[in-house]
UniProtKB/Swiss-Prot annotation:
Stated name of the protein: Undecaprenyl phosphate-alpha-4-amino-4-deoxy-L-arabinose arabinosyl transferase
Keyword terms: Cell inner membrane, Cell membrane, Glycosyltransferase, Lipid A biosynthesis, Lipid biosynthesis, Lipid metabolism, Lipopolysaccharide biosynthesis, Membrane, Transferase, Transmembrane, Transmembrane helix
Catalytic activity: 4-amino-4-deoxy-alpha-L-arabinopyranosyl di-trans,octa-cis-undecaprenyl phosphate + lipid IVA = lipid IIA + di-trans,octa-cis-undecaprenyl phosphate
Pathway: Lipopolysaccharide metabolism; 4-amino-4-deoxy-beta-L-arabinose-lipid A biosynthesis
UniProt record, GO biological process: lipid A biosynthetic process; lipopolysaccharide biosynthetic process; protein O-linked glycosylation; response to iron(III) ion
Cellular compartment(s): Cell inner membrane
Length: 552
């Protein structure tokens, strides 16, 4: 009965976290609008080999992540949940793999369910797993790779070992087709500490070639197909997207070595109090035959690799969370049989986070905030109340697990529930009107649908326009952003209109129909005075629509 109740509670939490709130949240630019539009264009064109974005070649990532994202729009249409379905699906499958591995490493199914609970309700896992990016899909393949390696190493027969290594290669091959060569490096460095400690070199060298071969076999058809269709793909993808991003001084998203430490600590909420003990247990496991040290290497080695890399984004460390969830579940299992100090500390952390969030909203971000730079407007008192309630829920469950830790520590999983359910409604208007272009697009849909040409100076906004209007011919105004490479091809001529060319371009092209220019204004809200006067203007925060009617 307890087993059924545990699964039922987990299912209810999953629905409340990953299903209920997602349709109502507007898409964020640039990430969600980008991946929504790439999949829409892939489905519309039927070309599942060469990724295109706004009708241009887009070689920042391989293709398998888009295939998974395509499923959402293919099954559920063009809603916001459909766009996020790929991330949710990948997160669920990763959680099932966490259960599978935890069931083998921990004693009994209950700790394995706890591992899934910790994984699905960790802040970073939830935030990224309900957000339309490729990292949850990549994490799925990396989790599958690490589970496959463990399966192979624990097999007692040569056939079983071979099967595990073949699955390892297939997972790495799919990871490679999702985010590139990183998928081949992460499993290698992740297993290295355990292989050294357990002296598993023989099986690694005997069966490792099977993994290499299966990775090649699953990825080779697309590798050859993309090379045939686009001969420059591999040069650009390898040099620009790997060497420059991870190693060179001009890498994108540069950040210091310690960048990921606070991301990890915040991302592990509401389970942060369990981290020190879990890491300690993992280190102690280096001298045993158990899996604790394997999990520790899986968590730490990729974390160090990402920290060394020049380019950094918070989502990159998502593959580290599956092993940490299992380590923490094992640590909790030992705690409940000994003393619950770490559980009380975890409850205290959550109580303080909840109270701190409430204080930040009421004293800093509210219209009456003490800093004089509020995030909420005077007309958004309702949103202030909702935000306060969201963090109040966090504090409530934190207090419950603090004062009744042995009985109610699992309710830490509900700490994020208020944020998950209310964030879409409680988001400040100035955030919505700079990061969620649907706020403007849906208000101006008749004007945009009537436009012969549409331009934007923001790639993320342009992607939102293309996805909402179901047209890929959105032109860039003055800026290229991440479309610089695609715009460099001769057949992309005309997709970029520079600011100094715009008056003449406008005079010529408005003869064919109305023209809409959608701008993402700078933070100071200044509008370029050199822009031609528009026939219609609509502004929502930093989003500005200028429409020019057709003229003979």
């Amino acid at each position: 009965m307890k087993k059924i109740a545990g699964w039922f509670t987990l299912a209810v939490l999953f629905v409340l976290y990953y299903i209920v709130p997602l349709p109502g949240r507007l898409l964020w630019q640039p990430d969600e609008t980008r991946y929504a539009e790439i999949s829409r264009e892939m489905l519309a064109s039927g070309d599942w080999i060469v990724p295109h974005f706004l009708g241009l070649r887009y070689f920042e990532k391989p293709v398998a992540g888009y295939w998974v994202n395509n499923l959402g729009q293919w099954l559920f249409g063009d809603g916001n949940f459909a766009v996020r379905f790929g991330a949710v699906l990948a997160t669920v499958l990763s959680a099932l793999l966490v259960f599978w591995l935890a069931r083998r490493l921990l004693s009994g199914p209950r700790p394995a369910v706890v591992a899934v609970l910790i994984y699905l309700t960790s802040f970073l896992v939830y935030g990224v797993g309900s957000y339309a990016v490729l990292d949850p899909i990549f994490t799925l393949w990396m989790t599958a790779a690490m589970c496959s390696f463990w399966l192979g190493e624990q097999a007692s027969s040569a056939r079983g070992k071979a099967g595990g290594y073949i699955l390892l290669g297939l997972a790495c091959g799919m990871g490679f087709m999702t985010k590139g060569f990183l998928a081949l490096a992460i499993p290698v460095i992740a297993v290295l500490p355990w292989v050294i400690a357990q002296r598993r070199w023989k099986s690694l060298f005997c069966f490792g070639p099977l993994a290499v071969l299966s990775a090649i076999l699953i990825s080779l058809p697309w590798v050859l197909a993309i090379a045939q269709h686009e001969p420059d793909y591999w040069r650009y993808f390898f040099w620009v997207e790997h060497i420059q991003r991870f190693a060179e001084d001009n890498a994108q998203h540069k950040a210091p070595f310690w960048y990921y430490l606070p991301i990890l600590l915040i991302g592990l909420l509401p389970w942060l109090g369990l981290l020190p003990g879990a890491l300690r247990e993992g280190w102690r496991g280096r001298v045993s035959q158990g899996g604790d040290f394997y999990l520790l290497g899986w968590a730490v080695m990729p974390f160090l690799l990402f920290s060394i890399a020049k380019g950094k984004l918070p989502t990159y460390i998502l593959p580290c969370f599956a092993p940490l969830a299992i380590l923490m579940a094992g640590y909790v299992q030992r705690l409940t049989g000994e003393n619950g100090k770490a559980l009380r500390i975890n409850g205290l952390i959550n109580l303080l986070v909840g109270l701190g969030g409430m204080a930040a909203i009421l004293l800093v971000l509210a219209p009456w905030g003490i800093t004089g730079h509020p995030l909420f407007g005077a007309h958004e008192i309702g949103k202030v109340i909702l935000g306060t309630i969201a963090f109040g829920v966090w504090a409530l469950f934190g207090a419950l697990s603090l004062y009744h830790s042995r009985r109610y520590w699992r309710w830490s999983a509900a700490c994020l529930l208020g944020v998950a359910l209310l964030i879409g409604t409680a988001l400040p208007q100035q955030v919505m009107e700079s990061k969620q272009p649907q706020a403007l697009i849906q208000a101006a849909m008749p004007q945009l649908q009537a436009s012969r040409y549409i331009l934007s100076d923001s790639v993320g906004v342009a992607a939102g326009l293309a996805w909402e209007l179901k047209r890929s011919d959105i032109y860039m105004y003055d800026k290229t952003g991440e479309l610089q490479y695609g715009l460099s091809y001769p057949d992309a001529a005309g997709h970029l209109v520079k600011a100094e060319q715009f008056p003449a371009w406008l005079a010529e092209h408005r003869k064919q129909g109305a023209i809409s220019l959608v701008l993402l204004l700078p933070r100071d809200g200044q509008i370029n005075p050199a822009l031609p006067s528009a026939d219609m203007t609509l502004r929502k925060g930093r989003f500005l629509l200028l429409q020019y009617q057709q003229q003979p």
